[in-house]
Amino acid sequence: MRMKKMSAVYMGLFCMLCTVSMADVLVPYLPAYIHGSSWWQPKPGVSWQWQLSGTLDTDLDVDMYDVDLFDTSASMISLLKSQGKKVICYMSAGSWENYRDDANVFPEEVLGKYLDGWPDERWLDISRIDILGPIMLRRMDLAVEKGCDGIEPDNIDGYSNDSGFALTSEEQLTYNRWLAEAAHARNLSIGLKNDLDQVQDLVSYFDWALNEQCFQYDECDLLLPFVQAGKAVFGVEYSLSTTTFCSQANSMNFDWLKKNLSLDSWRVSCR
């Protein structure tokens, strides 16, 4: 059956919709943008501690602590900041964790396969920012309420994993850029966690990088754009001896640690 001829008004509206970009679609999920760059933007050479389990050791002489958003109290964050520390708060932005306080707000339709080695976590369908956006914004708001200086969003490389969804590189870039813009709108610093293959496309959006085991897998060169942009690159090795990676990490101007996989208080710093 032939379609009726569209009216000029209808055609105009149709053409306007054709030009709507993904950025326009995402606008409702962002607050008014904070102009300027007043959030923390670390340069290479920042001493740090990454502790996500066990009793927090607050006695370290470091510039920055990376701690769990949900498990760390506002009073503990306040204590660290009173000592002159910057506090980054860990949150997973690409996986569902069944033990989190807000686990019940994620609909089943955005939950994918379980992460390899992590039976309590499932990949998220990051193409559904209409669903995940409000949830992640509430987490960022919690970071602001607790006094975090920034966030470490984990598992933001689902497109390159067996997530259970046919995620594309472009969908991942869109989601990761959205995370960065939403964090900055709240005056939060944000780091690019792993996702090495997209560093070139994301270095201008993120304030620093955090990597696990790039020396073990011989892929640290992919992080150099951050250092070249004057941005800190934090990282850890779990299995390698410090004698096998610290010298190279220092020469690349990376801030590297040797840590236990449990990310308890134990650490050895390369510099």
Each PLM stretch: what is its role?
Residues 10-18:
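Bacterial N-terminal signal peptides
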Residues 2-10:
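Bacterial N-terminal signal peptides that target proteins for export
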Residues 26-28:
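Short, cationic, amphipathic peptide segments
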Residues 30-271:
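Glycan-processing catalytic domains of CAZymes
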